[in-house]
UniProtKB/Swiss-Prot annotation:
InterPro entries: BBLN_eukaryota. Transmembrane segments: none annotated. Belongs to the UPF0184 (EST00098) family. Residues 25-74 form a coiled coil. Keywords: Cell junction, Coiled coil, Cytoplasm, Cytoskeleton, Phosphoprotein. GO terms for biological process: apoptotic process; apoptotic signaling pathway; bone development; bone resorption; gene expression; intermediate filament bundle assembly; multinuclear osteoclast differentiation; osteoclast differentiation. GO terms for cellular component: anchoring junction; cell junction; cytoplasm; intermediate filament; kinetochore microtubule; subapical part of cell. This is Bublin coiled-coil protein. It comes from the Eukaryota. The lineage of its organism: Eukaryota, Metazoa, Chordata, Craniata, Vertebrata. The modification Phosphoserine is found at residue 82. One of its GO terms (molecular function) is molecular adaptor activity.
Length: 83
């Protein structure tokens, strides 16, 4: 609805807009800081995850090699026992 001068009605909270701007800037700065901390933590977790993944790949390969060696030994043992 328009006012007597043809202007649109002023929102109820428009008078506190300036107060919200200064609070909003501080809030944005705090949120930005928290997001930076979260990003840093996520980077650290990603590095740990990559390291663990590499170690698990090494362990998996080692276990494969060990299993193959045991299978070869078991396969050769009966052949060695027979004359």
């Amino acid at each position: 609805m328009s006012g007597p001068n043809g202007d649109l009605g002023m929102p109820v909270d428009a008078g506190t807009e300036g107060e919200n701007d200064s609070f909003g800037e501080a809030e944005y700065a705090a949120i930005n800081s928290m997001l930076d901390q979260i990003n840093s933590c996520l980077d650290h977790l990603e590095e740990k995850n990559d390291h663990l993944h590499a170690r698990l790949q090494e362990l998996l390969e080692s276990n494969r090699q060990t299993r193959l060696e045991f299978q070869q030994q078991l396969g050769e043992a009966p052949g060695d026992a027979s004359p």
